[in-house]
Amino acid sequence: MKFPKNLFLVLFYTSWKFCDVCAYTPSHPLVYTKYGSVIGSVEYSRNSRAYMSFKGIPFAKPPVGDLRFKAPEPPEPWNFSINGTKDAPFCIQKNYFFSNPKVEGSEDCLYLNVYVPKTEGSQLLPVMVFIHWGGFFAGRGSSDYIGPEYIMDKDVILVTFNYRLGVFGFLSTLDDNAPGNFGLKDQVMALKFVHENIECFGGDNNRVTIFGQSAGSGSVNLHLISPASRGLFQQAISQSGAALDLWARPLNALQPNVTAALAAFTGCSAHIGSSKDIVDCLRKIEATKLAETADNFKYFSIEPLTPYSMVTEKQTDANPNPFLVQDPLESLKAGAFMKIPWMVGSVQDEGILRAAPLIRQPETLQTLNSNFEKLITQMLFLQFSAGANASSLLKNMTDFYLGGKSLIDVNNPKSVQGFINLYGDRAFHYGIYQTVILQLRKGHKPIWMYNFNYKGQYSYGDKFAATDKNVNFTWGVSHCDDLLYLFKSPGLFANLQKDNDILMSKTMVSFWTNFAIYGNPDPHQNLNWNSLNFEKPEGVKVADLNIMHITGNHETGKIAFDVEKSQILDRIAFWAKQSLLENFPDFG
């Protein structure tokens, strides 16, 4: 098998002069980037299509030593061929989402993978860049979690990458000593690398679609807003996360306390009062020890998922390219964001992310029910939204979702589902709808919306539960379950086996790659999935939105694709009626 030479263009006389030679051998293709050459391998897609795999390409200098807690810097050129046949280390983390978490990964982790399908033509291919999930404290872009085999059946190039997490990615002293948002700035650096180098791989840097799930989804939306990301992509897909979800909002006021606590945990508290001295001290702490400090912040179960957050930054000589200069809500209200083709959606039961472990772990459930009001107030950031009225908001929530009871009754399916809905709406659905409405009102089009409610053989909910124990309840479609059909994940799940699961996977891949190729998930209108288009968008309401509902399961023959109104209008209306700081007029 040979790849046609026109996959790799020789660009001696263009602005891409660094692509001086692009050569290959039948089994180990070689590509020259701006910084040096990479030897890849030839692999095969689900449908046995050959594709080239280039893994472990550095897109920034290792963020270690003096570069810890600093914005990423471009990689140093290399004068040898990088072995791109295996994944590079993922970013150091402790993944509390899964059972028996331990510190793993490396601080030297800013690497990306590029996957290029075999094609017969000479035209540059559209590019899809995936931003991984993980709550900004876990996750990876490596092929054991984000495998390319399904997408490589289509005529697109796929790029995956790592970015700094937890304390390494999001510590902030709110000044030039550690301005913060380093993980998001890593994402920008990866996009810059793609912009500068993807043509060497046969990709079109004017047809780049960024897409992400959960934390990656919120990141995608923030890239629409950030001035640092301008011009680096042309389309976007957000899966289960948006800029107005609370976990994607900057929380500057909390960070001084977080930094002070971290200093105490690491023996750096003598330097309190001098952010420079604190950061200098923290740079000397061994990476594993620093990662372990996340344990010290936990007050219940794995809460908080992470104490670190996005922050707004000031542009200074020492911080010339801040990622966020104001709260995303203010940017959206001002219409200060990229109005490019955007596909956005969620899964039916987002709340399983935390409901599964809280309910399926008996001791955890007992603790939660014994201290329900206090713990739920903390977990769902009620004081952030309602201030002194948090207790009133809590009562309204329990009345609406839990039948007026301040506990989860595992013997009552309505109670279990009610808690799933409560967590999912608070953490995901409401912020997504807020974001879409506000962006529509500011003239953003085209936008496509979807809701994913297909129940397959496997579920991330079983991973998040972190136990084999269960309750008598039929669990629905969990947060992250859509990923099962876009990416092979051999580090987490066996191969898809059920006919319907495989069919769903091929359909989802078609939607996503159609969007990347044509700017439309349903370009031939086979399913009448139209973008949201309003003559007077300034008055649009949630009830006006037409959403693609994807439903079915692996046990029956029917998979359905229906464009309908939202199925959770009553739940969105509930939150819109509450006195929340993040609410804005005439929403609902």
Swiss-Prot record:
| Alphabetically ordered keywords of this record | Disulfide bond, Glycoprotein, Hydrolase, Secreted, Serine esterase, Signal
- PROSITE patterns given for it? CARBOXYLESTERASE_B_1, CARBOXYLESTERASE_B_2
Name which cysteines form disulfide bonds. Answer: 91-109, 268-281
Q: Does the keyword Lipid metabolism apply?
A: no
Name the GO cellular-component terms: extracellular region
Secretion signal span = 1-23
Lineage, top-rank taxon, reads Eukaryota
What's the protein here called? Juvenile hormone esterase
